[in-house]
Every structure is written in C-alpha cells, then in structure tokens.
Amino acid sequence: MGAPKTGNVRNVVLVGQGGVGKTSLAEAMLHLSGKTARLGGHDGTKPTLDYDPEEVKRAFSISTTIAPIDWKGARINVLDAPCYPDFIGDAFAAMSVCETALFVVDAEAGPQPTTVKLWYAAEDLRLARAVFVNRLSRPEASFATTMDLLQERFGTRLGAVTLPWGEGEDFDGIIDLVRMKARHCNGTEAVESEIPEEYRAQAEEAHDHLCELVAEADDELMMKYLEGEETLTQEELEGLLSKAIAERIFVPVFAGDCIKEQGVNSLMDDIATYFPAPTDYGEMPLIDGDSLKISSDDDRPVAFVFKTLADPQQGRISFIKVLTGTLEPGLELINARTRKSDRLAHLYVMCGRDMTEVGHAYAGDIIVAPKLAAETGDTLSITGKVEAAAFKFPNSQYRIAIEAENRGDEEKLYTFIEKACKADPTMSIDRDEETGQTIISAVGEAQVSVLLNRLEDRTKVVAKSVPIRIPYRETIRRTASAQGRHKKQTGGAGQYGDCWLRVEPLIGPDGTSDGYEFVDEVVGGRIPRSLIPAVDKGVQETMKDGIIAGYPLTGIRVAVYDGSYHLSLIHISEP
C-alpha cells in the first residue's frame, strides 16, 4: 500500500448512535474494496476493526480504529470511532483530523441523542457532513420517514443522493440520483441497470430536488436554474456536488444496508469523487490563535498526534495526521509541548490491528508511528514552534476509588493506570494525600471497567472498587471563649501559665466556612511575645483531629486576648 498524494486523500470519520452499524459499514467497505476476503464480524467471521477482547465481549467499539481503503484512485481513510458515551472522547479526537463526518443512522430508529450531540460537534469543527441511512432491509425501515426526521432535526440542507430500491424484505439495491441508474450489489460487484419504471417518477423528482440544493453553491447557475432557463448538466451537477459538500452548503444522504452490502459501493464512489480532500478543508487552528494551512507544497513537516495506544503486542503507538510536508523514517522532530526531540524510526499504515510499513507519508494522510514519547494532542515539527490547538475532550464526571486486592501490587496498579491516562486524556488518576486512596476520574463506569479488566489481563493485578472516603471537616457555628491553663510542679522549679482564647466562625466570600486565622490581641505583656507562636502552633495541632468526630477543623478565627504567667518559675525573659 503506497503513500497517497494529498489531493487523493479522503479522511472520513464514522459517527452516530452506538449500535447502528458503523463498524459493520467499515467492514463492508473493506470487503467490497478487496481489502478483506469476507465481511468481517458477520456469519462467524472475525472482525478486522473491533479486535480488542473488550470490544468483542461488549459488542461495541471502545477505541478508534482505521480502515484505509484504496478506491477509484482515492485513499479513503475510514476512522471508525466509538460513540458509546463513556468512550466518546475518541470520537472527538478522530473528528478533529478528518474533513468529513459520516453519520450512520438506523432506518427504523432515526437520529438519536448521540447523533445529535456529535452533529453539532462536527458543525463546531466546520466539517463536511454526510449521512448513511442503514438497515433498510429491516421490517420497519423507512427511508422517507428517516429523511423527514433528519430534516426536522438538522434542517433542509440535507438531500438524498441515493434512494432505496425497495424497502424491508423487498430492499434490493439503490437508485443513484447523480448518475440516474439503479445499482444492485452482486457479491462484491455493483451491477448497474436502468431505473425500474415504478421508481422513475420518484427518482426524477428527487433528482430535480438534488439539483436545486447543490445549485446554491453557484449563484449564477442557481439563478438560471430557478428561472427555468436551463437544467444542470451531468458535469455541472457533479462539479457543484463537490463544491456544495466541501463548503457545507449541502449534506448528502445515502441509502443502504451494510450487512447486505447494498448501497456501499455507491457510497465509496461518491466519497472518492465528491468528498473534500485535506486541502479543501482549509486550515488547522494553532494554540497561538493563528492557523496552519494543510499543504503538500510546504516542505517543513508538521505532524499532529491525535491518539496514542498502548498495545500489549506492539507497544506504544501514536496515531498521526501529517499537516504539512512529508514524513520519512529516521526524521527527527521536536515536540512543541516538551521541547524535546522525537525520532520517527518507522512509519506504518494501520488497518485494524495489522500494520504495513511505508517509506513516507504526505500531507493530509493518517499514519501511525511506534515508540514515540509524544502524547495525545502533541504537535511535532522541525522547529518545535508549531503547536496545534488541542481539541476539547468531554469532562470526567465519574469518580471512583480503587485498590489492589494484594496490597503489594499498589505501585504496579498505579503505574499501569497512569500510563493509560496519558493515552486517554478523558481519564486521570490521583492519590488523595488525606485519605491515602487512589482515585480514578473518567467519563463513565464502563470506561473504568474496561481499564480494570485490561489491568488484570496484562499485569495480573486484580483491582477492586471501594467507596470514596469523604474528607469531612468540622467547623463552628458561633463564637465562644475559653481559658487554658498549664501548671506543673516537679519538686524544683515549677511551670505555670494560662491564656484566654476566643474562637469565632470564619466565613469565606462564597458563604462557606473555610480557612484559619490567628490573631494576637494580647496587650500589656500578659503573655510573652516569644510564647505567642507556641499558642498558634497548639491551636493548629488541635485542629488536625477536630473536636466532635476527629475530622480536621476549618473555618475558624482564633484570637488570644489575655493570659498570665510566672516568669521566675518558668525562666522566661522578654527579648
């Protein structure tokens, strides 16, 4: 598999609600392109993409995988992103390096909550968008209803580029509205024929609507079309289709069924022909507010690490998008964050778990490199002065305390999870200094469950979750005064001293009890100045264990305001 030129690259991320067939669509694309001999993940065939034991067990994707497909002169890098809520951070990372987000929608269920969330994320990233309406062979499938729901939710810029040839049990292929042909997948070959007469009127009406939508990409043609002066030629339609998709004027909607592999050939044809290349996308935002144009003409290589993976067999793997220039094995680049050098010893194209070594990678392409020190979100360049703006990961809202069943494994546990958190910024690990517990923060419970299963599988360390011990605090509600007295006689010189303390609530700006203040209000030398710090120290020592339940005391102001002592007995003199 050679390195594609920038203009031939199509980076497409598959997103949508979990369980709608995104991975199955990618597997169908691999099969129909000849990359795999059989349709992965179907009829007992092992999947190429969801290869992780946790993915196999749970039957959904938990990590982004890549399916590079050579089709009609284009390299289509399909990024199959997990969209289960706990792992959606990977989807955001994948979207940040693609030019097009392809939403897979179930023909029975329509657009669901995760689809909506990711739709607006793609809009914020200014990605081109497309929709594949899947599972049209199911009994309750309806392309028309799904189209209505999509347009109701996302607007009227969406338009069909293919229609279903039958639905439910009668679904037998698609009608291509650009080429005005019917297509049926027979094995891995798409058989083209004339549109059946019973679908002719529907197809012509949909074709006219498609022309009207994409004509908005050209003001002059739009006016002529609306005034009825002319219809769009095939050449004009195809040219406008590319422009309208790249400029986000139009969202193409495809009909199909990835298990039956119907409509997938046409989808790949249109991705290769009409979807934007990296140079059409524009510029990558930089951390300093500037931007970097993705270009093969710039001879200064810049690479962006959008994902890191700790593979038990292959070690640490960095997923990279080449932003400018050409990457080659042996190239030394500087990390903008650490200012340290990283050497690209080898470059690979990755398909699922399989890796194929390549001699170079051009701007716009997505490749992987092993054993880099770079972390997710890092930018590598010749000067180290270029730093891409980091994408925003979802907030970690789930916290749990864990501990090793064998107390001797605590350090091994912490080290493994710390490395996993560096690869996935949606997770973090911390050791609570007060309670001594190891705390994991993550997006959700399933994410932690996968992490602990991998910990046991790869290190044989068994960990369990335990309740987080809450670091309670004690405080006071009203002011009080008290006297403390010290008196000691040991046969020789005696010790005597007493002091009066006033303790009052200390309320912070937010209205909560917080902090500690010590005030010296002693006058007339009633207590020697040299002993005042000892009073403060004694108060703070007492605060550590609290008064009522043994929790630390906070939110108090303590004033020492009176006292007495016998100087001759305790041998103290004023400085």
Description of each model-found segment:
Residues M1-S573:
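Structural and coupling elements of P-loop NTPases
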